[in-house]
């Protein structure tokens, strides 16, 4: 390499003649106490040479920028990034206004008394909770506010004779090495949120000075026959709920004590205070200048896809793209890389002599450069686990030293485990935990928000941004890197562009704003929104609502009965409908049922417990007959449902926000308002699911089953009401004449969870469009109580109804809407999609084909053999004949013949191994090529190999192109015939095999059926 490398002989360097060596004043000091074994690419000594060179040295981490050399770390507490983030700020003495983006719970013990103000020393004896509020001040300085005196507590109902104090003391003494804590007990009277109950119970409130022992104490009490409540509530939730605070937003501190000694964070400013000194400022919605870092790593992988535990598979480059929230300036672009690198336009390049030095720079950037949010693409599954593995297994970095805080620091990635007992592995996500940093993996976000054939960054960028990656195969990276500064610049440019695309995606979706609004509404830390599911969101809100009514929440025992009858449908009547089909939807169906019927834990009376409430008359409750027997819910005049109250408040707030949004002109405020209303919508819809998960935080399957039961009944009642409306009655209900044919009628042809498909036979489109909303409103007012509401959602001009959740039709605006058909399935290849689409277009838009479809739809399956195909239907056969010729002539591109299937679990966990995508995975593995990640979609093409099982015909499309392999013509054509049959089977009594046989019967081609 052409700059001075302090770890190897520079005379055996890279391709340039000039060797940049530091002047004597630049020469590094060598701390004798730090000895590191650095791994250096062997190509730095001998151009093109593979492998690494191990050098044992005491040099401090070093970087180069142009002719300048510097040290990554400056002194004991600094780094290059600390000096670049600006001047140190002076701490205010009496008044502090600051914004919080994250809250971290830590525990101080008595040996820390000298580190904290005298007034808080007794709060940490023997231990005490300290909440670290991380954020920015008004002038943009990073700040950590250490909040003392926040207690955690739970409740217990102890049987007669249990000495509570003795049990707690015994449990604390056997604390298994955990920090001891102070505790106190207090008798209180509370209602229990489990079922309808007018009684208040004498329970003990157990308050702890810190939380590490809470689980131990709770378990011990349970063992002694006590029932415990709310022992699953942490100190952060108590802090937010008990004092009306928030996990994200502006705070005012009236008595901040600056901490200048014994600093416990890496922020610019640090203060100590009590929770009593804080005041939340809800009216302020603007963001401070938070920094978002988008990063990407490139690795060597000389023997195949990189393996972090192999010395030679080192990280060679890390791109860092930074954006300041509220700043429209171009991104700050940096490239950290090994060896020399040619300049890149608009990119600040840092050159490092070894991987160790580069990792030191990147990790210290996370800590010292005021980065609050990090993003990337698949960083939870690849980039961060790879960095962690290199830093801790190859080197000896203490990653806890590179977060925002010191006490209680965490820097790790929790990855789901597979296995036959893996539970919800397929739905689980890797969780990034870095204290004081909010991770946003845009791979996970895009999988949630988009429906694509695959979720590679290139595919997503094309779809969302209209741009492509500067793609380089991982196989090309090692030779480019070894080739010298020019090759490393090409890899670096590719690396930087990836980070730019990810930042663009984040800003397009405004994911950081969305998760902050959900965090505020759900009262959970922002970093938990994307990975911790919806249960914790509803739980926090229910906890708050329960507290205001004097309720305490039980802790589930884990023995809940799972399973209940979920949402069912009105069976579809398959066929082709050339009359208008009106689709009506229940607005917010499940939330509205909870509100309308006053459903809640607090209003529930199990079927065998009604006799315990003799004061109730039949008018005081509503009865529902579930699969396990009847249950009852008291009506609102006896007790209002807590869940319904929550929903009512949320929905009223959403309505108000949307009204404000309509007249808002400030773009930043508009984004925040839009994400607020979206957060409310998502959380409202999660309430039903919260009750219906048997393994959830507070399951109540009686509520969930009642909701779905009412949903079914509402569909059935709506069907009966609408189908009974004659043209004359419709005119009477509308109070005006309606243009219809004499035999006009309504027929419900399908009902799906919250919607009805009504075929308006004998009505024209204009008439249906005219009365659609009124018909929905009349049905609502006649059948249902508020706030249940039926709305006209859409009208089909014609509809091909296949089976449940599978239909395709032309809407009133002439657009085609498809659901569940092969055309839009991720597993279908483009050739099959395009040809099927051509057939579908004929059926939906070509008059002669429409007429043929309508005629066939009313006949027996064997009718076409007796009468022949109607004239219009021959056009479909012609499309299939032409498609076969294209396949035989090899005129179909390989890309159009590519299928994709998701790798849903580790390979070893598949019971059936002879699946096409698994075959390709195994072939890639055998060739030591890049392996897909869990949840990636694996592409494959079927090639011509007579006598093999179908799964063995699968091959990666790039391999097919490189080797010019022939595709399996008959197999692809058979897939096309079956895809077309799936679309038109509703014309033939929904008999797929009969439809396939009919198509083959009328085709004009020689066919060899593929091996099954």
From Swiss-Prot:
Main localization (coarse): host cell
Enzyme Commission designation: 2.7.7.7, 3.1.26.4
Ranges for region Disordered: 1-31
UniProt biased composition (Low complexity): 21-31
Subunit structure, as described in the record: Forms a complex with the ssDNA-binding protein, the DNA polymerase processivity factor, and the alkaline exonuclease. Interacts with the putative helicase-primase complex subunit; this interaction may coordinate leading and lagging strand DNA synthesis at the replication fork.
Signal peptide (residue range): none
Catalytically driven reaction(s): DNA(n) + a 2'-deoxyribonucleoside 5'-triphosphate = DNA(n+1) + diphosphate; Endonucleolytic cleavage to 5'-phosphomonoester
Protein family membership: Belongs to the DNA polymerase type-B family.
Location of the protein in the cell: Host nucleus
Protein name per its UniProtKB record: DNA polymerase catalytic subunit
Organism: Human herpesvirus 8 type P (isolate GK18) (HHV-8)
One example of a Gene Ontology biological process annotation: DNA-templated DNA replication
Record keywords: DNA replication, DNA-binding, DNA-directed DNA polymerase, Endonuclease, Host nucleus, Hydrolase, Multifunctional enzyme, Nuclease, Nucleotidyltransferase, Transferase, Viral DNA replication
Assigned GO CC terms: host cell nucleus
GO molecular function terms attached to this record: DNA binding; DNA-directed DNA polymerase activity; nucleotide binding; RNA-DNA hybrid ribonuclease activity
Entry keyword DNA-binding: yes
UniProt function note: Replicates viral genomic DNA. The replication complex is composed of six viral proteins: the DNA polymerase, processivity factor, primase, primase-associated factor, helicase, and ssDNA-binding protein. Additionally, the polymerase contains an intrinsic ribonuclease H (RNase H) activity that specifically degrades RNA/DNA heteroduplexes or duplex DNA substrates in the 5' to 3' direction. Therefore, it can catalyze the excision of the RNA primers that initiate the synthesis of Okazaki fragments at a replication fork during viral DNA replication.
